[in-house]
Each structure stands twice: as C-alpha cells, then as structure tokens.
Regions:
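Hydrophobic transmembrane alpha-helices of multi-pass small-molecule transporters
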Residues: 21, 61, 194-197, 246-251, ...
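Residue-level signature of the transmembrane alpha-helical core
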Residues: 10, 14, 58, 93-97, ...
Length: 300
C-alpha cells in the first residue's frame, strides 16, 4: 500500500466535501427532519441541499482522477470498470430490496416503533395514485422504481463514489485481508460523509451522533458491496447496489411513525442488525458452500 498516495486521495476527497458541508450550513442545513410536518418544509432549502448531496457523490471520482494524475498513473486502469453481466449482478441488485424489507421488519421490533399507514407522509405519497392503491402497492412500485433508478440515474451518481470506495481503494489495499480492507474502506467512506451528516443529512434529529452512526453503517455495508464487486469482477454492480439502496432505503419513513433516525431504517440500529445478519449469512455461504472463498482471502 502506498501511504502517500492514500493520503493524497483522502485529501482530494475530504477537503471539497468540507466545502459542500459549509455550503449546506449556509443554507440552513439539509432541510426537513424525519418528523417535520410537510407543511413546514422549506422546499427551496431542501432542493438545494439535495443538489449539494448529489454533487458530492462525484467528489470521490474526482479525487481518484486527481490522485492518479498526481502520481502519473493511468487514471482508471485496474479498477474493473466493465459491463460483463453475470448472475452476481442480478443477485446483488435484488438483495437490496430484500434487505430493505428486512430492515422494516427489524425496525418494527425496536422500542416505540409503530406501523402507521395513516401518516401524513404516507397519505401524501398515495395522492395521485389510482383509486384502490394501498400501502403494499406503493411499496411494490417503490421497489420497482428503485431498481430501475439503481440501474440508471442513481447508479450513475453512485458510480461517482463506488469507483473510489470499491475501485481505487481495493486496488490500493491489494494484498491485504478482505475484512481488514472492508474495515478501513468503510471507515473512510463513513467519515467522508461527516460534513453533510453534521448538517442533518440522514440523521436530522441527531446530527452529531449521526457521524458515528453513518460510519458504523458504512463499515457494515462495505463487506457486502465488496463481496459482490469481487464475485462479479466489476465495480459496476457496487454502483448499482448503492444506487438501488439510495432509491428505496427511505421506505421505512413512510410506514413507521414517529420516526427515530438512530433506531429505525437502514441507517439506524435496525439497519445495522440487518446488515450484520446479512454479512454472517454471506460469510457462511462463502466459507462452507462457495468454491471461491473471498471473506477469508486477500484482496487480489
């Protein structure tokens, strides 16, 4: 591992992200909280914050390019950017909706959680739907649209991150243990979010604790994304899975009320438990069923 190169990448990724955080702070934060009355939402502020968050997703890609140019190396060589579709693409993309619904179930087991299909947010979401459309129809549509978005627009934005986290960093950690690499990559990925988390992104009710929570989430999600990236031989599936996640992870907000961003949802404790169980299941499959052991191997 080239430590100087890694530090250069981190600086290129983190410093502009601080700028995004400052810009978000100047407009008053990320916008609405999880329990904010829809009538009180500042639409302009929320849209600007969303645009800043979306733009931030390309900062890791820029950091990779600038780092490679600094060290006079081919910009995207060896990062496994290919579109050779195989079964791992399909399994990876479909795994995210399964994990999302498992997280909803886990959230409902948390203290104070209540299944609430009459929440104002749910009723707003149902407006404009054909008569007779209920909660499960909305969830189904959300899942399908999330999958489509993950393959298209969301996947494109997620690629801006994944080319760094599951592309560049995997290459830099070549020869290191899989889980060691996952721990370091997840920590870097999580802390990179800090400037926008502190401004209310993902954890609007607990922005300071949210920095720690987001880091834990990224550490737990990273082995799963790395596993599918390694099995598929392409960083693209990591971008698709990341994109699908971004498209459907908010389903918990629709059906659980009042919402606690530290306990419920994909980035709360319920999500952590779900991801931990998923990691254990993949590890057991990898260790006892698969012919190719990745979790216990070195990054090649």
């Amino acid at each position: 591992m080239n430590t100087k190169k890694l530090i250069t990448f981190i600086l290129w990724a983190f410093v502009p992200m601080v700028g995004i955080g400052i810009a978000m702070h100047l407009i008053g934060g990320s916008g609405a909280g999880v329990n904010t009355d829809p009538a009180d939402i500042n639409i302009v502020q929320t849209l600007i914050a969303s645009a800043l968050s979306a733009a931030a997703m390309f900062l890791p890609l820029i950091a990779v390019i600038m780092t490679q140019l600094t060290f006079k190396e081919p910009v995207l060589k060896g990062l496994d950017i290919n579109f050779k579709i195989n079964k791992w693409w399909v399994i990876g993309a479909l795994l995210i909706p399964v994990l999302t619904m498992a997280t909803v179930g886990m959230s409902l087991l948390m203290p104070g959680a209540k299944w609430d299909t009459n929440s104002e947010l749910m009723q707003m979401s149902l407006q404009g739907m054909p008569e007779g459309f209920g909660v499960w129809a909305l969830i189904g549509i959300s899942m399908i649209s999330g999958l489509i978005a993950g393959i298209t627009i969301n996947g494109l934005f997620a690629f801006g991150e994944e080319i760094a986290w599951r592309g560049f960093l995997l290459k830099e950690f070549k020869g290191k243990k899989f889980l060691t690499t996952a721990l370091w990559t997840g920590t870097i990925w999580g802390l990179w979010h800090a400037p926008i988390i502190i401004n209310g992104h993902n954890y609007p009710e607990h922005p300071v604790a949210g920095v720690f929570m987001m880091t834990i989430f990224c550490i737990l999600f990273t082995p799963i994304l790395m596993y599918f990236r390694q099995r598929s031989g392409s960083v693209i599936i990591a971008a698709i899975m990341h994109g699908v996640f971004n498209g459907i992870a908010g389903i918990s907000l629709l059906i659980i009320s009042p919402f606690n961003d530290l306990l419920y949802g994909a980035t709360g404790l319920a999500g952590f438990i779900t991801l931990l169980i998923a990691n254990i299941c993949i590890y057991l499959y990898d260790r006892h069923i698969s012919k190719e052991n990745i979790y216990t191997s070195l990054i090649d």
